[in-house]
From Swiss-Prot:
Gene3D superfamilies registered for this protein in UniProt: Galactose-binding domain-like, Pesticidal crystal protein, central domain, Pesticidal crystal protein, N-terminal domain
GO molecular function: signaling receptor binding; toxin activity
Keyword vocabulary terms for this entry: Plasmid, Sporulation, Toxin, Virulence
Keyword Lipid metabolism (UniProt): no
Miscellaneous comment text of the record: Toxic segment of the protein is located in the N-terminus. Encoded on an unnamed plasmid.
SUPFAM superfamilies (UniProt xref): delta-Endotoxin (insectocide), middle domain (SSF51096), delta-Endotoxin (insectocide), N-terminal domain (SSF56849), Galactose-binding domain-like (SSF49785)
Protein name: Pesticidal crystal protein Cry1Ag
Gene: cry1Ag
Domain of life: Bacteria
Keyword rRNA-binding among UniProt keywords: no
Alphabetical list of InterPro entries matching this protein: Cry1Ac-like_dom-VII, Cry_V, Galactose-bd-like_sf, Pest_crys, Pest_crys_dom-III, Pest_crys_dom_I, Pest_crys_N_sf, Pest_cryst_cen_dom_sf
Segment forming the signal sequence: none
Length: 1176
């Protein structure tokens, strides 16, 4: 040190205000095993040991999950709390630490079980234990990770979130690789693999999003703000982004062997020099541009340092850097001068030695220089010297010292990644660049001379300088940019910057060094994102090797996310002709102005099966499994139409770039399979082109059924059946398989796929009725409940996105009449067909029905196909059932002849002639109902399972029922009173006072007049000169009389009076008295009541069926239909005792009469009022 009497004091650097050691609330992160140490160790482990197995599992235990306690997890939280100046509330902190502790305990059990299983992989008990441990671990992680994303604390919890996400992905990779050996079925393994690929994207995007949010939060205008901003960027790159950049390697089907990944991003240390108060005002905007712009990786060759002097003090005044490109040979590049040239001493050149500079020890110096008396002082803040240490895995290399060694150690902020070896071998980063910003500030009284802001820029130690391509691993290589190709900042999850090209042309070249024999063959894969379809061309040493079409992955203007990138390769393998070769990549056949991004180029040994090949192999196996032989002549019987659709989806989703020819060939085969499936399907219109389109063929159904186009579950049309509010009006769908299409003594099967259903009843009806009730509570969807269903760019279902696979173990087959188990996606029912007599035309009815309010169903891919000929016991059984059915038919015909004769006589008696166009004069409503009841005693007119389907006696029933309808119509035509039975309440009636219409227990609506001042009336138009029969059925309670009066404006009044009968009263014009009515009621079976002739097409059917060939005699009782009235008949109960029917003759003199109802005392109850026109 110079002896200068004007030097007042010297302040050591470690006494200066340093934002690095500022703490929140007095807390301080302890040195040693810090979150950065742990994250660096984990990243080094992931880069070097990324191979599934017990070694990887136990490695995670050793690094984190087996040694961490609450204090270590709390250190992760404190780290970000300090950086963003936000404390996590106690509840969120305790919840996070508790969850992490639980995961740690559970993973240690998982790891020990894994170790034991790997030592004895065929042991059934250990395989079962691994299944249990995996399910427990996966469930715990699925539950815990969302709790590490607490609202308002996403940033401070981010590093522990990433640690848990990394653990989850590793566990899912384990089951994807080893699940089959543990005993999981293929569908479960595929489902967990789909979870893995989905969560790689979800966890990546979440981490990058909240990293950027935190980074924006710590930005400020001054130099001290920038220091904290840079610290957040550096430390969360190490604890978050570096780990996230390796998430994609967990895709076990894309990276099935060891993969060499490289982190090419750069991070900055804290400024080696900064002014003593740490707050250059407004300097952040000047400092940030000094952060090196996006670039491809290069190698630091040398630093030439210049020395200047001020007031007798020598210091680092400037420097120049030279670098060499990585991945190709080229001239050394010299960067412009940082700072200023100095001539106080010769320039000192720090040359690259060994594995590069891994450590710097800098000596900053602050001096306050007193210039005489007064305030005119100077402050000098300079770098007095630096020692540069060189990395080596074997020996200690001598360091190079510029002037002198200092105390500011770069390892304090970026420590080694392996503390088990000396830092020269366990280093985590190498020096790649040294930017510098200098400033001299002046004032009237104060001079700050030559103040410097100097940063050390480092790149990860795993970055390899020479693009070595071995034979046993997947290598991700670096690139050289070409004119019109630029380097842009990576989106945060790529581990470095990426290439961008807006127009066609050459994108990149790289030199690769081959350590394997030149006979080794490779395939190229590219991780890319772009806004347009294009064509990639590749070549080696000028020799073209690949050409393929690639498709857009994102829309113009959208942000780069993990889902924007795809990794796709070429199908044609190649080999290198030289040990050092130049690989080139170019893009063509797209319009300028689009965005083309390249993240990395991968070289994969040709023997490795990766995702596109796996997809092709799976599609090929799926197509081949559809057929009975290699010549594709016939389909396998167990291959469903739904499964053919799913196989076609596999084919359609194959990569055009990778296997276009194979895709076209497989497409033709699967189309052939679909045509064969259609040919063997005996159902008409299985694709639901329409319902009720044709009367004599195809599907018939209720009007509330909807046909919908394909979705993520169904490739073709499917139907949706909704619930009903009345079981007598069910939702139904049916079709008949004609007898002519069936083979004698053959078994047939109905099958299909149900996306979800409740209370869906399925019937097959031939010689016997087969029923199945299926409930599938939404498990048919191919997407997890918590995951949104992916869609294409035009809103169509994206069937190529990861989803659940078809699982044959979920099939449900119901035989011999039993009900189907719940939660079945595939259903099937078998039915045996006997002799196919075309004269009988029995056929087979296929029925789907829902009769409950909560019922619903979505189903498709329906098939009815021949299964096998009946032989042996099955043949004998169906012949026995056939004989019983014929015996029943003979007996039914004999019974029907008798019942038909009686019913026809009752119907004929209603009319005056065989033309059935005029009723007998004395025909009343009771007689019509009585005849209707006898018509409905004809059995097997309609199927009891669904009353809209005609049975064997449908023709004669319809014949007589039509005449009953005619009788009702003729009766209505001659009864001129509207709503005389009060079935529609008080409609058409005028009311004064208080009256009610009540429905009584016998299902009759009656008018109740409870007060003497009340009156009900109706004006009726009549034909003057014609005769009418006023007829009233009523009941009087209590004292007094009930009166029904018919009158005109002037005189001509008649009335019917009702009282509580004590003695018989005879009215001159009455046709019925109190005593007479009982006889009349008995004659017609008590059928006289209000009627409902609505046509209901859907009865309810009990779900309990006898076994298939159980005897059921027609004479022992029919299968009753509780909705019998749906064809116009209702088994009305008789009138209660006390009701009286009275009538008289009336001849109006005008065209209007009034009917008035009233009473004098008590209550008057009126069942019906009629005014019947006399026949001429």
């Amino acid at each position: 040190m110079d002896n200068n009497p004007n030097i007042n004091e010297c302040i050591p650097y470690n006494c200066l205000s340093n934002p690095e050691v500022e703490v929140l609330g007095g807390e301080r992160i302890e040195t040693g095993y810090t979150p950065i140490d742990i994250s660096l160790s984990l990243t080094q482990f992931l880069l070097s040991e990324f191979v599934p197995g017990a070694g990887f599992v136990l490695g995670l235990v050793d690094i984190i999950w087996g040694i961490f306690g609450p204090s270590q997890w709390d250190a992760f939280l404190v780290q970000i709390e300090q950086l963003i100046n936000q404390r996590i509330e106690e509840f969120a902190r305790n919840q996070a630490i508790s969850r992490l502790e639980g995961l740690s305990n559970l993973y240690q059990i998982y790891a020990e079980s894994f170790r034991e299983w790997e030592a004895d992989p065929t042991n059934p008990a250990l395989r079962e234990e691994m299944r249990i441990q995996f399910n427990d671990m996966n469930s715990a992680l699925t539950t815990a990770i969302p709790l590490l994303a607490v609202q308002n604390y996403q940033v401070p919890l981010l590093s522990v979130y990433v640690q848990a996400a990394n653990l989850h992905l590793s566990v899912l990779r384990d089951v994807s690789v080893f699940g089959q050996r543990w005993g999981f079925d293929a569908a479960t393994i595929n489902s967990r693999y789909n979870d893995l690929t989905r969560l790689i994207g979800n966890y990546t995007d979440y981490a990058v999003r909240w990293y950027n949010t935190g980074l924006e939060r710590v930005w400020g205008p001054d130099s001290r703000d920038w220091v904290r901003y840079n610290q957040f960027r550096r430390e969360l790159t190490l604890t978050v982004l570096d780990i996230v950049a390796l998430f994609s390697n967990y895709d076990s089907r894309r990276y099935p062997i060891r993969t060499v990944s490289q982190l090419t991003r750069e991070i900055y240390t804290n400024p080696v020099l900064e002014n003593f108060d740490g707050s250059f005002r407004g300097m952040a905007q000047r400092i940030e541009p000094e952060y090196r712009q996006p670039h491809l990786m290069d190698i630091l060759n040398s630093i030439s340092i210049y020395t200047d002097v001020h007031r007798g003090f020598n210091y680092w005044s400037g420097h120049q850097i030279t670098t060499s490109p990585v991945g190709f040979s080229g001239p050394e590049f010299t960067f412009p001068l940082y700072g200023t040239y100095g001539n106080a001493a010769p320039p000192q050149r720090i040359a690259q030695t060994g594995l590069g500079i891994f450590r710097t020890l800098s000596s900053p110096l602050y001096r306050r220089i007193i210039l005489g008396s007064g305030p005119n002082n100077q402050e000098l803040f300079v770098l007095d010297g630096t020692e540069f240490s060189f990395a080596s895995l074997t020996t200690n290399l001598p360091s190079t010292i510029y002037r002198q060694r200092g105390t500011v150690d770069s390892l304090d902020v970026i420590p080694p990644q392996d503390n088990s070896v000396p830092p020269r071998a366990g280093f985590s980063h190498r020096l790649s660049h040294v930017p510098m910003l200098s400033q001299a500030a002046g004032a009237v009284y104060t001079l700050r001379a030559s103040l410097f802001l100097l940063l050390v820029l480092l790149i990860h130690a795993r970055s390899i300088f020479n693009n070595i391509i071995p034979s046993s691993q997947i290598t991700q290589s670096f690139k050289k940019i070409i004119s019109w190709t630029s380097v842009v900042k990576g989106p945060g999850f790529t581990g470095g910057d990426i290439l961008r090209r807006p127009s066609p042309g050459l994108i990149s070249t790289l030199r690769v060094n081959i350590t394997a024999p030149l006979s080794q063959r490779y395939r190229v894969r590219i991780r890319y994102a772009f806004t347009t379809n294009l064509q990639f061309l590749t070549s080696i040493d000028g020799r073209p090797i690949n050409q393929g079409n690639f498709y857009a992955t994102m829309s113009s203007g959208s942000n780069l996310q993990s889902g924007s990138f795809r990794t796709v390769g070429f199908t044609t393998p190649f080999n290198f002709s030289n040990g050092s070769s130049v690989f080139t990549l170019s893009a063509h056949v797209f319009n300028s102005g689009n965005e083309v991004y390249i993240d990395r180029i991968e070289f994969v040994p040709a023997e490795v099966t990766f995702e596109a090949e796996y997809d092709l192999e799976r599609a090929q196996n799926g197509v081949n499994q559809l057929f009975t032989s290699s010549n594709q002549i016939g389909l396998k019987t167990d291959g469903t139409d739904y499964h053919i659709d799913q196989v076609s989806n596999l084919v359609e989703c194959l990569s055009d770039e990778f296997c276009l020819d194979e895709k076209q060939e497989l497409s033709e085969k699967v189309k052939h399979a679909k045509r064969l499936s259609d040919e063997r399907n005996l159902l008409q219109d299985p694709n639901f082109r329409g319902i009720n389109r044709q009367l004599d063929r195809g599907w018939r159904g209720s009007h509330d059924i909807t046909i919908q186009g394909g979705d993520d579950v169904f490739k073709e049309n499917y139907v949706t059946l909704l619930g009903t509010f009345d079981e007598c009006y069910p939702t139904y769908l049916y079709q008949k398989i004609d007898q002519s299409k069936l083979k004698a003594y053959t078994s047939y099967q109905l099958r299909g796929y149900i996306e979800d259903s409740q209370d869906l009843e399925i019937y097959l009806i031939g010689y016997n009725a087969k029923q199945q009730t299926v409930n599938v509570p939404g498990t048919g969807s191919l997407w997890p409940v918590y995951a949104p269903k992916p869609i294409g760019k035009c809103g169509e279902p994206n069937r190529c996105a990861p989803h659940l696979e078809w699982n044959p173990d979920l099939d449900c087959s119901c035989r011999d009449g039993e009900k189907c188990a719940h939660h079945s996606l595939h259903f099937s029912i078998d039915i045996d067909v006997g002799c196919t007599d075309l004269n009988e035309d029995l056929g087979v009815w296929v029925i789907f029905k829902i009769k409950t309010e909560d019922g619903h169903a979505r189903l498709g891919n329906l098939e009815f196909l021949e299964e096998k000929p009946l032989v042996g016991e099955a043949l004998a059984r169906v012949k026995r059932a056939e004989k019983k059915w014929r015996d029943k038919r003979v007996k039914l015909e004999w019974e029907t002849n008798i019942v038909y004769k009686e019913a026809k006589e009752s119907v004929d008696a209603l009319f005056v002639n065989s033309q059935y166009d005029q009723l007998q004069a004395d025909t009343n409503i009771a007689m019509i109902h009585a005849a209707d009841k006898r018509v409905h005693s004809i059995r097997e007119a309609y199927l009891p399972e669904l009353s809209v389907i005609p049975g064997v006696n449908a023709a004669i029933f319809e014949e007589l029922e039509g005449r009953i309808f005619t009788a009702f119509s003729l009766y209505d035509a001659r009864n001129v009173i509207k709503n005389g039975d009060f079935n529609n309440g008080l409609s058409c009636w005028n009311v004064k006072g208080h009256v009610d219409v009540e429905e009584q227990n016998n299902q009759r609506s009656v008018l109740v007049v409870p007060e003497w001042e009340a009156e009900v009336s109706q004006e009726v138009r009549v034909c003057p000169g014609r005769g009418y029969f006023p007829r009233v059925t009523a009941y009087k309670e209590g004292y007094g009389e009930g009166c029904v009066t018919i009158h005109e404006i002037e005189n001509n009044t008649d009335e019917l009076k009702f009282s509580n009968c004590v003695e018989e009263e005879i009215y001159p014009n009455n046709t019925v008295t109190c005593n007479d009515y009982t006889v009349n009621q008995e004659e017609y079976g008590g059928a006289y009541t209000s009627r409902n002739r609505g046509y209901n097409e859907a009865p309810s059917v009990p779900a309990d069926y006898a076994s298939v060939y159980e005897e059921k005699s027609y004479t022992d009782g029919r299968r009753e239909n509780p909705c019998e009235f749906n064809r116009g008949y209702r088994d009305y109960t008789g009138l209660p005792v006390g009701y009286v029917t009275k009538a008289l003759e009336y001849f109006p003199e005008t065209d209007k009469v009034w009917i008035e109802i009233g009473e004098t005392e008590g209550t008057f109850i009126v069942d019906s009022v009629e005014l019947l026109l006399m026949e001429e």
